[in-house]
Design a protein with these regions (language model features):
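NAD-dependent ADP-ribosyltransferases
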Residues: 1-218
Length: 218
């Protein structure tokens, strides 16, 4: 997980979600994250090392970002859920995920933790450095977490408990269009939010959905 907060803070406090909203579709769109209602119960992490570099590159290349980013390596356990079983559960109950949302889920390799990632699950922090000339991100200095407790690494294979089954309209689904890095993977807002994490919120790039809207409203 990529975050702009320094290791001493994260190693002390761990990561916490914005709130208690278990609507997974809102989380995947970013509607319940920093750019939206800021009440998501889910903490987004990724199994993809490449994705952490992509996330860091997006924010380092932004003229509005002037901080340092860290990649936090986290040991998953029973509080971590792969989103696919829950997405399948929602799909079976009539919830529609757009092609765009499917792409985001596939590209981001997202694993979510519910409400809190304790310090003892956080292995280390690695400073991510940015070369503006080559637009490349690389690993810098690493810091181990003295509070980390070793153990087995696994992901809960079940559906997320108390998952909200939303009633989704076509008009609501329009909000799904945006940056390929969803708002929950964006750095902005709540600076308390991990596998790999981030924080500091910037507006996603505008996606021109007019052609798609014409098809939706035929």
């Amino acid at each position: 997980r990529v975050d702009s907060r320094p290791p001493d803070e994260i190693f002390r406090d761990g990561f916490r979600s914005h709130g208690t909203n278990r609507n997974l579709q809102q989380h995947l769109r970013g509607d319940s994250c920093a750019a939206g209602s800021r009440d998501s119960a889910f903490i987004a992490t990724t199994t993809s090392l490449i994705e952490t570099y992509n996330i860091a590159r997006q924010y380092y290349s932004s003229s509005g970002f002037h901080g340092t980013l860290y990649r936090y390596r986290i040991r998953a356990n029973n509080i971590f859920h792969s989103i696919r079983p829950s997405v399948n559960y929602l799909t079976q109950r009539g919830v529609t995920f757009t092609g765009f949302e499917q792409i985001m889920m596939r590209e981001q390799n997202e694993i979510v933790a519910i409400e809190h990632i304790p310090s003892e699950n956080i292995v280390e922090a690695v400073e991510l450095t940015y070369d503006r000339f080559n637009s490349s991100v690389s690993d810098g200095r690493g810091t181990s977490n003295a509070r980390y407790v070793p153990g087995s690494t696994f992901v809960n294979p079940g559906v997320i408990p108390d998952l909200v089954v939303p009633a989704v309209s076509v008009r609501e689904r329009i909000n799904a269009f945006g940056s390929l890095i969803s708002a929950c993977f964006a750095l902005k807002g709540v600076r308390r939010d991990g596998l790999n994490k981030r924080s500091t919120y910037y507006e996603p790039e505008f996606y021109d959905a007019r052609a798609v809207l014409k098809e939706l409203f035929k």
